[in-house]
Amino acid sequence: MPTIIKTTCDPVEEKLRTFVEGLLGGKVTAMQRLLRWRPAWNLELQRDGQTLKLHIRGERGGDVSPFPDLRREAEILTLLGQQGVPVPHIYGFCEDPQAIVMELVPGDRDVSTAQSDTERHAVARQWVDAMARMHQLPLQPFIAQGIHLPTSAEDITLAGLQAYYPLYARNKTKPQPLAEFALGWLRRNVPQHRTRPAFVQYDSGQFLFENGQVLGLYDFEFAMIGDPLADLASARMRDNYEPLGDRFADLYRYYQHVTGEPADPDVVRYHTALFATVSTMQFSASVATPQPGDPHDTYTEFDIALRRVVVHALAEAMGIALQTPKLDMVSSGPNAQLLTMLADALAQVEVVSDFQKTKLRAVSKLLEYLGRGDAMELHLRELEQQEAQVLLDRTFSDYSEIDAELEAFVKSAGPEYDEPLLRLFMAQIERRVLVYGSTAIGASASHIDLPPVT
């Protein structure tokens, strides 16, 4: 007999309904939680004979955000809307639970739903227009809101790093040699001519369109004042899994046309490496030391994909060719029978709500990932130990020593070690993608292919 998991009325949703009705009047007649890892809902409110469609954005949860105050994002969206940037209208902010109540912007992000290539290209250019408009906004309203204004070229370029680093340092529980290597390279190679700060989304390329029209930009959780080319770089990364609608190089040229800014492709490449690095730092502790309640499948997916982007972006910036190492694969490990039993037991669990089904799928994805680890993880560690011993010219008695020694080495090594260190990290991540890339969690990492800048 299948196991039935009963669900009850969610007290969080009751609080949100009560708040919305008190804020706007009327009656909430429909409320749907979105099937994603972050709490979010779409609502319909009946008021004065009309239907008002709303979206509620809840707290991310955990300690993975450089700007954890959700109210900050609500205030940013309000400022942007007041200055003509297409963003959702903000109706209010709920304190318990913390959540933004905003307009539900219609449309889709998936550009494959456009009617033609012509429409896709037009939509992509409308997004560039909106981003460029944002980059020209006066900064004083944002400064008055408490957003830091960087002034020197180094501060402007490294604004994202400075925002994310305290989060990384506070939560760091284990050595992170790749992140420390990337940080060292980025700090040594700051472009010194980027002296104009702008308001940036810092996780760009997120927009909704309908009938060939961009109706809104969304997700300003990480927005700050920094180098406008950081937005081009983060959108370039996003193009891997959420296509922008046209070739990135063409959109970058269009951005230059709209803004009058000269081409600076090396800086876009630099910011690609920087954004990938701070994004990896953001989730590194959540994967190294998992916390109860975290979306473990999502954070593991982010971790392996972002680490691969760090390596690819650094290789591009350094002019080093990518290499895929050879690896003898094994299909199953010593715990294969037990994992098969666990998968079967999981398949016998039935849940009622669609949301709980997503939770069950998350467990299934972790189990699939674990199966590949059971088959290959020890071999991966053996290879990593051999390579680290050669580079560091010492013998390790235990695999657990490697990351600590590598981190200490990258912090003291000079630029002459950049290439051998990058090649070591490249071999590590490429082998892991060979092992885990066929899983649902590893699929994103297997599709990493940064589009050309020019």
State each model region's role:
Residues 64, 223, 242, 267, ...:
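Short, solvent-exposed segments of well-ordered alpha helices
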Residues 229-263, 274-295, 302-318:
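Active-site activation/catalytic loop segments of kinase-like enzymes and analogous catalytic loops
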Residues 12-26, 139-203, 211:
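An alpha-helical support segment within catalytic cores of ATP-dependent transferases
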Residues 32-159, 166-178:
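ATP-binding pocket architecture of kinase catalytic cores
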Residues 317-340:
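Charged, amphipathic alpha-helical linkers/stalks
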Residues 333-365, 370-454:
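C-terminal amphipathic alpha-helical interaction region
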Residues 38-45, 50-56, 90, 134, ...:
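Active-site acidic catalytic loop and adjacent metal/ATP-binding pocket
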Residues 26-31, 261-269, 399:
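Short, surface-exposed acidic
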